[in-house]
Amino acid sequence: MEEKKKYRFADEKEQLKRVNSFLATGYTIFYIVILSVSWESYFRGVRTLGYTGLLSVLTLIAMAINFLSTRKDKSQSRSRKIAFICFVVIAFLMAYAYDSYYVRFIAAIPFCGYVLLYDKKNVAVTGGIYFALNVFVNIIRIGVQHAYPKEVAIDHIYATFAIGLLIVLIYAITSVAEQFKRDTE
């Protein structure tokens, strides 16, 4: 008689646990980068202690919420939603306060993990929200505050366009992964 192999990730609940753990790691990396960037900018005199402290407290709270919600039940989609809300708040504060493009692109780390969910709608919604956040920041910084000279403003617009393309690419990869999963079931 042939022995059946047991595959740990054949169970969808086990898959969700692994994906949520992967996403939590991605968010943690994002938050660590945010903390290091904000403190480094404080020590260079670019940001005040008040802003850096506030951002640090919010980032540490987001990290704790992310950790606790993922630890409580790793298979819940609720923990992903909570983590994303915290992410959006921190990403907005960083996109608004910092001109560096890498700060906006580092946010792609958690989005890469969404491919493992095989959920195009999730990628479209969360990616759309993140893209809209970047457009909103550009409207405020370029259109309302006139914070940049023309050349720099154009660079920010192209960076936002590139973020949109990256999200579209992640969506396309998720779509293909979803098709592969369906075809192999």
Locate each region found by the language model.
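Transmembrane helix interruption/hinge and helix-loop junction motifs
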Residues: 96-102, 118-121
